[in-house]
Structures are given as C-alpha cells and as structure tokens.
Amino acid sequence: MDTLIQQLINGVMLGSIYALIALGYTMVYGILRIINFAHGDILMVGALTTLSAINALNTTFPHMPLLLQLGVALAVAMAVCALLAIAVERFAYRRLRNAPRLAPLISGIGVSVLLQTVAMIIWTRNPLMFPQILPMEPIAVTSGSDIDPPAIVTVTGIVTVVLALAVMTGLWLLVEYTRLGRGMRAVAENPRVATLMGVNPNAIITLTFAIGGVFAALAGVMMASNYGNASFSMGFLPGIKAFTAAVLGGIGNIRGAMIGGILLGIIEALGAGYLGELTHGVFGSNYQDVFAFMVLILVLVFRPAGLLGERVAHRA
C-alpha cells in the first residue's frame, strides 16, 4: 500500500507539470487548429534563462535571498518566453494559417531543432545544476512497514502541484469569465465572425501564444527544481508527453489538458513502479516512457477526440 501511495504521489506531481505544459498545446490548437511542436523547447529556454538570471543576480547582488532571486529570474524568464512564443507565432505560423496542415507541423519541428541548437551553443551540451530553492528533505506521509518504506513527499513537490493547480484554475477562469477569454472563444469558433464583432484575431492569437510561453517558462522552472538540473534537450520529451496528455484529455479543451496531464503522470508513475515486478525484472523503470506513447496510440485509435469528447474539446 505504501508503494502504491508513493507512486500516486509521484504521478500527481509529474502530471501537474505535464498538465501545465499541455495547456500551451491545447490553447494554440483550440484557436488555430495546429500543434506547436516548439512548445517544449520554449520550456527549456525558460529553465535555462532562469538559471542564467539567478547566476547573474548572485554575482551582482550576492546578499539577495535565493527565493527573491528566483522570483526575479522567473519573471525575466517568463518575459523572454512570452516574447519567444510571439516570435514563433509571427515567423513560423502566421503565414501558414491557411496552408495544408503538414506545413505548420514541419515548421514547428524546424523551430524546435533551431531552439535546441541555439541553446546548445549558448549553454553547452552538459546539464547544468539548478539551485536548490526549497527544502528537499522528505516528508513522510505514511508510517511504512517492514516490507515497504513510508511514502514521502517534498516541499518542492507540494509547491509544484499547488502552483500548477492554481495556474490552471486561473486560466480556466480567464477563458470563461473575462473579455479576453470571450475573445479567445470567439476566434476559436469562427475568426471571420469574431472580426465582425470587433475582435482582433491576430491580437488574440498573439496573446494566446504569449500566455503559453509564460506557462512553459513556469513548467520549465518546476521541472528543473524537481530534478536539480537543466539542459538544452530537457524540453523535447516532456513536450511530447504533454502533447499526449492534451490528446488524452481532449486537445483544445482546458479542463481536458488538466485531467489528461494528471492521468498520464499517474499512469507513467504506476508503470515505472510496478513494471519490474510484473515482468520479473525483465523490464525496469527506465521503460516508463513507453507508457506515455502507448497511451497516445490507444487514445488515437479508440477515442481520437479524447476523454471529454469532440463537442467539448471543440468549444473550449
């Protein structure tokens, strides 16, 4: 039982990060009906920019508290990622809105490779240590037993889940109850009619990409804080998994991204925790990535609209 609880805790923490990344995919798809495969690499830029900003602040203001350094650095990274996302939309996607669907897909992959290459040149190939901001001492949530150790959680993990849920809830409220949200839904439904109603589709699309960039920066810092390092390649695989989470929940739907992210994290954690036992050691936890792609294949085959269905996914 302690092992099960531990894997569920791990899954919720991991799934919160996936869900936050998936929001970027689902927002863009909801409006433009394209998949921004450069989104995961914007996450990477956010994490590495935060790290560079912390190092610069530590050099310039050595007595500044580390938590304050993180706040300032995160604000800088969010601004950088928002501008980067706007640039990606402007130069990689805007002229391809009416092109065949394969064209923006190839363009997004090209931007992804470009961002990774530039990041590798700036920050080198080697993973860089990310500073420990919050206490990493484990907190026991169960008493354990003679067979299983107690299930644990860290302060960083708790903050990750709480912050992700708060951000996701805030986005849902923004989309449902604000003028900007009404504009986003109008453009998603019919850009031409939205224009006749006084909505500027280009401005809405630009803001959507910017918000996605901010979320990517936050997710990148969450990942780097939990794993203790950041690298030029850190965004690709989580980006693909977050895309899987968006498809699982119903791509284009904000609630679907939340649900899909949490579910995918739990599935992956349970698979990693029990795969070795079920296969008698033939496969270990290093095969956990297989579960994410199995989920993607199964959803595309049996329920392409995702868990929340085509109607809801289309409207969000």
Segments (PLM) and residue ranges:
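Inter-helical junctions in multi-pass inner-membrane proteins, predominant
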Residues: 2-10, 14-17, 174-179, 205-249, ...
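Single transmembrane alpha-helix segments in multi-pass membrane proteins
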Residues: 4-53, 87-103, 246-254
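Helix-loop-helix "hairpin" substructures at the membrane interface of multi-pass membrane proteins
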Residues: 14, 149-230, 254-260
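Alpha-helical transmembrane segments within multi-pass membrane transporters and channels
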Residues: 25, 62-111, 118, 259-264, ...
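Membrane-embedded helix boundary and interhelical linker motif in transport proteins
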Residues: 31-87, 91, 150, 274-282
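Pore- or pathway-lining transmembrane helices of multi-pass membrane proteins that form conduits
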Residues: 41-45, 96-120, 234-247, 263, ...
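Transmembrane helix-bundle core of multi-pass membrane transporters
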Residues: 96, 104-177, 204, 270-289, ...
